[in-house]
Amino acid sequence: DVYKRQDQTCRDMELVIKDTAYAGFITKEELKGILQHKGIYPIGKKMERISTKSLERELSKHPLIDEAECYKTPSGKVCVEVTQRIPILRVMSSNGQNYYLDNKGTVMPPDAKCVAHRVIVTGNVEKSFAMKDLYKFGVFLHNNKFWDAQIEQIHVLPDQNIELVPRVGDHLVYLGKLENFEDKLARLKEFYKKGLNRVGWNKYSRINLEFNNQIICTKRE
């Protein structure tokens, strides 16, 4: 037996919640509450009777937890590490649906406490389109420092064409279909650096990236 005494009791539980910079949904108190409610809170229990698998199983049922890992130490401590699901997009569809999408394209409840600002998605957002295609675009924005800071809103038109509302500059960006979005945004970034920095960020009302190898700008009236 790895424990000092056969009848050693658990004297401490260490809880680690990962990804708190992006997701502030789950508190340590909440995790304790789940385990207490199920009667498997480890402190005070005999170490040999504590099932780390049961702890992992119960915590993983939580809708905001991606995975849970539990292990015991020889000194009588139980360690619990929880990975949260990361919200990428906040969907507020014109059909009344309201939810977060996580980094794996799974729907999260709208009442989740999100600590970081998330890109808002509006317009004709079908859930199937959001879970299959839109979330990948959201992950790209989230993982790219420049675009994460620059894009404030994604608007989905009835034909699933996409408009982007940037934080800086008073213009709309028309992306068209999501296909080749990386190439389209690379062109836009280049245009921002070379074009808009020279003529000013408010010269154009609309920037169209729909067609390959060109950018069509509409001047402000």
What are these regions (language model features)?
Residues 53-88, 103-106:
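Membrane-embedded segments
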